[in-house]
């Protein structure tokens, strides 16, 4: 009897928990078709071309000269994907936190769904091996990242985050894009991307951003987030 009672309680708990999880699932702003950006990007350099060899030599040259500070930064920056708040905190200050900006956090949670669903098909479309997969002389600083090399997800994420935050705080536009470029460069320093992957990521962000900004729901959420950020930053 006790076993039956416990089983009944477990089943009843699932009927409560599962709908709650479904209700809190985060969705993006765009349709599946709007997320398709792969064909808008220039292809990466083909294998055995001068451009690809130059790409590899750039990775090896950076690897040979990377400093202790660059290595530490590359490892820190690895955790900045899908993370608008730590990305911009050194620009906006220590109070730029999720707890103080719930509307902004909700906006980026939805945007990052669109980002992820745009990025991974583009990577699969081009299927470019990572530098360390193509040449054993490349010694990556990080565990193998998910997906192929082109375009860089961290670069795409950084520039997309900078683009959206610049809509809220245009006074900080230059600093935000400098941060994006620095974060992207960390991927080459880490040995997990080629320079052309970073350019592909930047172009991917500029392809996706106009589609996001044309979405009425995103615009409404963006305006609310803008007020929240500027109020908390006392701008």
Question: How would you describe each model-predicted region?
Answer:
Residues 24-190, 221:
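Hydrophobic alpha-helical bundle signature of multipass membrane enzymes
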Residues 129-135, 160-162, 198-206, 226-229:
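Short alpha-helical linear motifs
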Residues 182-213:
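Interfacial helix-loop-helix junctions of multi-pass membrane proteins
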Residues 209-235:
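C-terminal membrane module of polytopic membrane proteins
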């Amino acid at each position: 009897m006790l076993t039956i009672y416990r089983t009944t309680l477990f089943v009843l708990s699932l009927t409560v928990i599962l709908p709650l999880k479904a209700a809190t699932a985060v969705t993006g702003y765009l349709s599946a078709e709007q997320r398709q950006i792969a064909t808008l990007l220039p292809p990466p350099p083909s294998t055995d071309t001068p451009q690809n060899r130059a790409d590899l030599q750039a990775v090896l040259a950076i690897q040979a000269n990377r400093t202790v500070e660059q290595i530490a930064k590359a490892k820190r920056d690895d955790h900045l994907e899908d993370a608008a708040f730590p990305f911009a905190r050194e620009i906006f200050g220590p109070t730029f936190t999720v707890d103080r900006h719930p509307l902004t956090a909700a906006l980026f949670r939805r945007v990052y769904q669109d980002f992820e669903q745009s990025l991974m098909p583009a990577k699969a479309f081009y299927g470019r091996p990572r530098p360390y997969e193509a040449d054993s002389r490349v010694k990556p600083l990080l565990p193998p990242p998910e997906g192929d090399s082109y375009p860089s997800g961290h670069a795409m994420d950084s520039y997309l985050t900078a683009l959206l935050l610049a809509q809220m705080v245009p006074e900080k536009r230059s600093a935000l894009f400098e941060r994006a470029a620095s974060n992207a460069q960390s991927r080459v320093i880490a040995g997990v991307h080629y320079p052309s992957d970073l350019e592909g990521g930047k172009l991917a962000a500029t392809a996706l951003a106009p589609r996001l900004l044309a979405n009425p729901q995103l615009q409404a959420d963006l305006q609310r987030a803008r007020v929240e950020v500027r109020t908390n930053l006392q701008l």
